[in-house]
Amino acid sequence: MKKFFQEFKADIKFKSAGPGQKLKESVGEKAHKEKPNQPAPRPPRQGPTNEAQMAAAAALARLEQKQSRAWGPTSQDTIRNQVRKELQAEATVSGSPEAPGTNVVSEPREEGSAHLAVPGVYFTCPLTGATLRKDQRDACIKEAILLHFSTDPVAASIMKIYTFNKDQDRVKLGVDTIAKYLDNIHLHPEEEKYRKIKLQNKVFQERINCLEGTHEFFEAIGFQKVLLPAQDQEDPEEFYVLSETTLAQPQSLERHKEQLLAAEPVRAKLDRQRRVFQPSPLASQFELPGDFFNLTAEEIKREQRLRSEAVERLSVLRTKAMREKEEQRGLRKYNYTLLRVRLPDGCLLQGTFYARERLGAVYGFVREALQSDWLPFELLASGGQKLSEDENLALNECGLVPSALLTFSWDMAVLEDIKAAGAEPDSILKPELLSAIEKLL
């Protein structure tokens, strides 16, 4: 390979050196021999840049490793052809410079624009059912948890522990320590020392006192703060002491412990904003708000300009590491994705998803809208490419960001069985969805 590039460079230098000259020939003789109307020599062709040479060398090295087991030498033409085939194969796999499922996405617009495919990204509070903007999530959930103390203080304190404290490792350590306290009381109800927890204890201070919601939890399950005399000091110390009433109901402590260990942070749920549209030639056109992108407006414009150069990039020799780095950069550009599913009757089902959400969520979303939700079906990306059967794949890994138009297809074998039995599948979507069908603008 090194010899190939050395010969390539030498050939360029030789051709750019100009006409030959004899050693004994003078400059005057040379000028006399030249034709007076001879056109000016063309400028020498510029050689490949260092980056292009390095990338070419890396690609050729990969081919050399693959071909090292073959008999006989490999010609330079064969190497070039093999590199060209490899690049063409990569382009075929990817389908195009864009992912197979993506469609035309214009520049992001501000929320409130009349032609946005969705007005923005919204969430639903799991406690109140309120629809929230992204910047309203945390404040609304905290307020709902605090209001929940009036109806269920135990559940509210547990939600506060998991939700108000962001360091989940510290939360787990604190929760496990509280569970240990409750286990000791449950296993040794006759031991008075287990019914008292010293607040100034080092373990309590480092693992429990630093967490929001822990004091509310102790008080909600029956502990009371009491000042008790301390050994070898005049001033009393503060303890949590379990009340006699709670001690008489050990099963309640066990239930509260299990509830504490099984809890999770309260998170706002992404609002799918499910909509159904009439058949439209604009199905693949998406006007997305800025919330869908993890980029500034300037960065998005630059990405769109670079997208037009994708074909040219495919013709440049790149190492595998370079390609993987570009792919990973692309996966991090988007937070959300808007998907449309074209049904056999031409109607469109639309929903919003996280970019890193699993493919199974899309199948579940479509199945919930079907009148015959028990029938198997397939989803096809643009070009008729069937989506992966691995429902654990993330949507950005499937190229379905920041938007995509999918095609719905019944399982043909099952559909033929239904028709053979003299039946026809019911209307695809549920009646309540069809009653709210819209025109896509």
From Swiss-Prot:
One of its GO terms (biological process) is ERAD pathway. Residues 13-79, 87-106 are annotated as: Disordered. GO terms for molecular function: ATPase binding. The keyword Metal-binding does not apply. The modification Phosphoserine is found at residue 96. The UBX domain lacks key residues critical for VCP binding. This is UBX domain-containing protein 6. It comes from Homo sapiens. The lineage of its organism: Eukaryota, Metazoa, Chordata, Craniata, Vertebrata. The gene is UBXN6.
